[in-house]
Amino acid sequence: MGEHAKGETLSVAFAGPGQHQDAGAKMIHMAPHTQSSIVSKSIARGGGRAGYRGEVRIDANAHHSANTVRCDALLVDTISRSDTYPAIDIRVDDVQLGHEATVSRVSEEQLFYLMSRGMPEDEAMAMIVRGFIEPIARELPMEYAMELNKLIEMGMEGSVG
């Protein structure tokens, strides 16, 4: 790709019991004024392990380029795990680069709040997870977003109780 090229990667990984899901992305800037973004979301439950491996490289002639990386993990229980392995290689000094990573756990308070409004625990958990992946789902065509929500709900079956 040449000058002013743009790239975007969106990924969702779901790690259930006995699973280790490893997602990742690579963005390589080789020309000036290029832009890229990576957004990765992972969900782990039942002792599942979710990982993200990402690489961003900005070559010496890729002046005035920009990249953002955002990795978010949601742990549904206390026995699941998430790991992030970013690799950043910048070979020029007039670029913008941002990297954020968060790991959060579904809290008892979140569940209590929704359940106190009459929602069953399994539906409350599913709503929290759907809210977590919503930033990616809204970027997808409607039929893919619906399929993603169905897959998440299938993966969440049996997560409560």
Where are these regions (language model features)?
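Conserved beta-strand/loop scaffold segments within soluble protein domains that form the structured core
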Residues: 1-119, 137-161
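Small/polar glycine-rich anion-binding or flexible loop at a beta-alpha turn
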Residues: 107, 127-134
